[in-house]
Amino acid sequence: MPVSSRASPSRILWAAAFVLTLAASAPAVAKEVTVTIQNFAFTPANATLAAGDTVTFVNGDDMVHSIVADDGSFHSDGLDTGDKVSFPFAKGGTFGYHCGLHPFMKGQIVVK
């Protein structure tokens, strides 16, 4: 008796349901947002990201800078030219920050 190589409709439906279940349960990939410090400013000054994402600050200035959260939840030591520091954001919220050495330098991170 010949064997059919054609998939039955029920097999196709089960396979589709399986693939959709895998896709729906796959964890989101965390993203890294880079904020550059240059000319006494953060670029971008305002960043929006998802919970689980990381913000990396890179000092492109020829001056030492530091990162300080307005609410004290994170801070860095002084960053020399080319130095970088990363902060993961696990939960939602709005986080204002500034340079600890130059308080007029400000930014905001919104975590959704």
Model-derived segments and spans:
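Extracytoplasmic copper-binding redox domains, predominantly the cupredoxin/blue-copper superfamily
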Residues: 2-11, 15-20, 25-112
